[in-house]
């Protein structure tokens, strides 16, 4: 497990919410990312962007006070989407 830094960050306005899009170039299972959003997070999901082996697809993400843990079976690029209020 290691702390990740986003390669790119995009911020989009969605009315009363913002959509933060974080792109990571190489994530290993159980890596973490501290977004700094704290309890402002309202929803989140992630997509794996690498060519994955059948049976190893997908990424699971959990949130604890704005720190996200990314769990996946293979190492690869991941995009994290976070809906938040600021």
Feature locations, PLM:
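Extracellular attachment/recognition segments
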Residues: 2-86
């Amino acid at each position: 497990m290691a702390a990740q830094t986003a390669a790119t960050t995009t911020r989009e306005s969605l009315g009363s919410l913002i959509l933060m899009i974080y792109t990571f170039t190489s994530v290993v299972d159980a890596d973490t990312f501290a977004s700094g959003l704290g309890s402002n997070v309202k929803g989140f999901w992630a997509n794996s962007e690498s060519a994955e082996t059948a049976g190893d697809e997908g990424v699971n993400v959990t949130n604890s006070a704005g720190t996200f843990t990314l769990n996946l079976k293979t190492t690869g690029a991941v995009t994290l989407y976070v809906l938040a209020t600021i």
